[in-house]
Amino acid sequence: LLAAGTLVAAPLPGKDPVLLGPYMGIAHDRGLTIKEVTGSDFASEFKGAPSPIPNFGMTDDAYWTRFDLANPSPSPRSLMVEVAMPHLDDVRLYVPEGRLFHEYVSGRNYPFSTRAVAHENYVFPVELPPYFQGTLYMRFEQEGTFQLPVYLWDADNFHQADRLKQLVLGSY
């Protein structure tokens, strides 16, 4: 990890995921687009997360989060971002691709078949090119209780841990 709060994607320590809460900036959504949220006028709206797993209690609001990732390696990295709160209404991940963003959309307001990864939680694949450094954004909307347990996994470690979990659950 870098002192500035940038998470270095390679190597991730051990097989455990990294909890992203300590690296997140959080801002209340005022109906802005990704273009507006990434602009310099909105940058000061992002505040550090109040806890490793931010908890908003009962709400019907939407929030933006952002976190920096870096891949200092000459090889690409395959990662997974997991939102371990399967009852969120709308979850969006914005991954920088040049000057634009690739948008993943998920949440219980959408059919399961539209998920980027068929999983009980919201999971998004993120491919970091060599020497990547950039900011990823997420938008969350929820009516009801709302907390954000968001994890960053190495893709292989995610799949291995998920297979083991399914095996254990299947044995009951």
Where are these regions (language model features)?
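Bacterial N-terminal signal peptides
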Residues: 1-5
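Selective detector of the "anchor" transmembrane alpha-helix that sits immediately C-terminal
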Residues: 165-172
